Amino acid sequence: MRILEKAPAKINLSLDVRHKRPDGYHEVEMVMTTIDLADRVELTELAEDKVTVSSHNRFVPDDQRNLAYQAAMLMKERYGIKKGVSIFITKVIPVAAGLAGGSSDAAAVFRGLNRLWDLKLSMNELAELGAEIGSDVSFCVHGGTALATGRGEKIRHIETPPHCWVVLAKPTIGVSTAEVYKQLKVDEIEHPDVQGMIAAIEEKNFQKMCDKLGNVLESVTLNMHPEVAMIKNQMKRFGADAVLMSGSGPTVFGLVQYESKVQRIYNGLRGFCDQVYAVRMIGEQNELD
């Protein structure tokens, strides 16, 4: 039997870090939303009791470093499954981009194996499993738009943001999330208005949503990687209504209210950046084709 799941990327409309916790994690408040840039995760049942992961993309790990592998092993062990599964990931989301590609692949494995092995687990139960392997996995199980708190595993769903386009550009650099958090001075940063962002979304107020964009990690990454700042500036110059870095970077996204401006921004960025995408925000997982 074979199951196919889509694994959409996410962007952070608001990302705040409150403090470092005794367990070593950071206490965060994030407004996240899924976009229609998605990997495809194909699950094929194996009679042999093993988990394999493969991809056409050589940068995708095929062992326990891959969150998709961890998700499958966790479900096998937790529910005593003696069968195996082959996982093939068709990567569309850029790797190590601040778009939760690995977390979304893992979430897709949880959803897919729930069907493949007929476990009848609820989405909330799958999200709780997700929290055991990664902070973003819980959100990715559900998708849509949500406020994430704690270390990112506590999810409260909110309204879908007002209608707009999202243009993304990823420079050809890697960013160490651990290093970004290490450099972050929580007591000295200006914290974004997370509640204001939620209000803007619920009011379907595009301009207010643009005004409330914020990411406390952005200034750290911009200092470490000036090319990210260059992409931000160019995206604004080409006409994006608002621009922000997603997660710890290096991907930058621009919100664009009118479709007529999207192609110009896309073409302008493609002049110097290979990985550029024009997409939409989506609601729950079932809104994906």
UniProtKB/Swiss-Prot annotation:
GO MF, any single term: ATP binding
Catalyses which reaction(s): 4-CDP-2-C-methyl-D-erythritol + ATP = 4-CDP-2-C-methyl-D-erythritol 2-phosphate + ADP + H(+)
Active site per the UniProt annotation: K10, D136
Swiss-Prot/TrEMBL GO biological process terms: isopentenyl diphosphate biosynthetic process, methylerythritol 4-phosphate pathway; terpenoid biosynthetic process
Family in the record: Belongs to the GHMP kinase family. IspE subfamily.
PANTHER family given in the database record: 4-DIPHOSPHOCYTIDYL-2-C-METHYL-D-ERYTHRITOL KINASE, CHLOROPLASTIC
Protein name as catalogued: 4-diphosphocytidyl-2-C-methyl-D-erythritol kinase
Organism: Bacillus licheniformis (strain ATCC 14580 / DSM 13 / JCM 2505 / CCUG 7422 / NBRC 12200 / NCIMB 9375 / NCTC 10341 / NRRL NRS-1264 / Gibson 46)
Gene transcribed to yield this protein: ispE
